[in-house]
Amino acid sequence: MCCNYYGNSCGYGCGYGSGYGSGYGCGSGSGYGCGYGSGYGCGYGSGYGCGSGSGYGCGYGSGYGCGYGSGYGCGYGSGYGCGYGSGYGCGYGSGYGCGYGSGYGCGYGSGYGCGYGSGYGSGYGSGYGSGCGCGYGSYYRSGCCGYGPSCYRRCYSCC
């Protein structure tokens, strides 16, 4: 499945992909990643992630970002980005990007893209997504959503 599991808030990307990249990574997108979006990730969105949303939620924090916590949640931080943490959450960072972390989370970086990480996370890279992931844009790619009104409250499968 791509996009998210609740049919809403695709964010700047969707699916298992990452912001400007691909894979189980992170950045400005949704899915297992983090940043601005939804899914198992964090940032602004809903689902198992945290930030301004619901689900397995996060710890202490404010704004669209995540708070301090671990496990399915996010680490310490604020804004659209993720904070410091581990496990399914995100690492340390701010902005639309992801912070430093490992596992299902993201690596170190900022902006719309992804940072440096390991495990199911993504490495350092940018560009318009590929594979199951989507890139930043007002169109659909690989059966997923880009950023745009038509993206919200829809779900797609591309894996």
From Swiss-Prot:
Physiological role: In the hair cortex, hair keratin intermediate filaments are embedded in an interfilamentous matrix, consisting of hair keratin-associated proteins (KRTAP), which are essential for the formation of a rigid and resistant hair shaft through their extensive disulfide bond cross-linking with abundant cysteine residues of hair keratins. The matrix proteins include the high-sulfur and high-glycine-tyrosine keratins.
Tissue spec: Expressed in skin during two hair growth cycles. Expression restricted to the cortical cells of hair follicles, appearing first in the cortical cells processing the flat nuclei located a few cells above the dermal papilla.
Highest taxon of the lineage: Eukaryota
GO cellular component: intermediate filament
Lineage: Eukaryota, Metazoa, Chordata, Craniata, Vertebrata
Stretches for region 66 X 2 AA repeats of G-[YCGS]: 11-147
Keywords in alphabetical order: Keratin, Repeat
Position of the signal peptide: none
Record note on quaternary structure: Interacts with hair keratins.
Keyword GTP-binding belongs to the record: no
Protein name: Keratin-associated protein 6-2
Organism: Mus musculus (Mouse)
